[in-house]
């Protein structure tokens, strides 16, 4: 699917802004304000300092047990940082798509799970994230664009192309993993955790969830017609794809997981599972997270990991209260050294085993 370079030059492209004004009838001042608001939602995300990271969410903590190679691959005009985790004798490979506000390293526990169970893994940082190029993350369709290019890179790579491919994504990575099924027919299985259905309509749906139905503007005076036009210019035909269309376009096994108390991607509003009645295929397995697994991120982890995460946050908060100030880097690092990183990031074994079983049954 074709891409464009609007992510690089739209800020200074008066012709594009003029086209939006002509098409929408909006005043230039309104367009500039709306654009600034939109762009503020999608900044660049840098990797946090390791002393602020709890859990095995940094490669330095697992490198003795998990081999990987790094490389760059193109996504339109951008170079994305890719990571390959080999597994001896593996004939299958899982492509892992990270969530927003995160990067590839934040899914190392899941990468390790697949590698230790016989799969090679390909992961990458999305545009505007961690080690990849890009001044911003651009929009909600970005992970789909990046995954499309990642799969094209794999298809044309002499060594990577020999693997049977599987997809695993979380949140906006789950949206990408399911939506891309419309474009790539060599995928053998797909698992999406807490995915939303459409990157194109998500902002509108979030606005409707909190402010009710509206005709002309989003919350904060965000013009709806600007939003539609701007995203169409940024992402072109990618805006026409969504998870339901992707799932309905294939008969490969698909695993959809979502927590009932997900306050990021609402179980009842934006989620793929809320569109269950639109899915015609019988190839979908649903996993509903409840209790400790009901949240957007807690669905990923074991019950004891979730309990330990709460304990660590409580202890950190208490330490800050005792100091009556923000901790210094040295104090934060000292606290971090006493955290059981393995326990903190332990995966939801029930869910991951179900995904693994589904993948293992695929040809």
Give names to the regions the model predicted:
Residues 111-133:
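Conserved alpha/beta-hydrolase
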Residues 179-236:
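Hydrolase active-site cap/lid region
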């Amino acid at each position: 699917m074709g891409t464009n370079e609007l992510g690089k030059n739209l800020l200074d492209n008066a012709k594009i802004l003029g086209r939006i004004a002509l098409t929408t009838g909006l005043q230039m001042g309104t367009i500039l304000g709306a654009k600034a608001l939109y762009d503020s939602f999608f900044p660049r995300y840098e990797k946090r300092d390791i002393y602020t990271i709890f859990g095995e969410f940094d490669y330095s903590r697992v490198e003795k047990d998990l081999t990987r190679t790094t490389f760059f691959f193109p996504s339109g005009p951008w170079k994305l940082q890719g990571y390959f985790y080999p597994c001896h004798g593996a004939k299958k490979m899982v492509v892992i798509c990270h969530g927003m506000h995160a990067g590839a390293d934040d899914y190392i526990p899941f990468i390790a799970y697949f590698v230790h169970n016989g799969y090679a893994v390909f992961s990458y940082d999305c545009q505007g994230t961690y080690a990849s190029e890009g001044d911003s993350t651009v929009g909600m369709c970005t992970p789909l664009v990046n995954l499309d290019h990642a799969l094209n890179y794999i298809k044309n790579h002499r060594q990577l192309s020999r693997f049977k491919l599987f997809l695993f994504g979380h949140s906006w990575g789950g949206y990408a993993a399911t939506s891309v099924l419309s474009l790539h027919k060599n995928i053998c299985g797909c698992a999406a955790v807490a995915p939303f259905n459409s990157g194109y309509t998500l902002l509108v749906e979030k606005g409707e969830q909190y402010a009710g139905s509206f005709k002309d503007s989003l919350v904060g005076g965000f013009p709806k017609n600007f939003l539609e036009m701007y995203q169409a210019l940024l992402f072109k035909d990618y805006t026409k794809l969504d998870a339901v269309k992707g799932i309905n376009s294939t008969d490969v096994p698909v695993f959809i997981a979502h927590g009932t108390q997900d306050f990021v991607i609402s179980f009842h509003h934006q989620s793929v599972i809320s569109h269950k009645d639109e899915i015609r295929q019988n190839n979908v397995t649903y996993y509903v997270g409840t209790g400790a697994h009901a949240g957007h991120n807690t669905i990923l982890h074991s019950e004891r990991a979730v309990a330990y995460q709460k304990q660590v946050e409580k202890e950190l908060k208490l330490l800050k209260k005792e100091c009556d100030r923000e901790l210094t880097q040295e104090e934060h690092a000292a606290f971090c050294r006493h955290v059981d990183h393995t326990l903190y990031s332990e995966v939801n074994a029930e869910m991951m085993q179900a995904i693994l079983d589904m993948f293992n049954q695929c040809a």
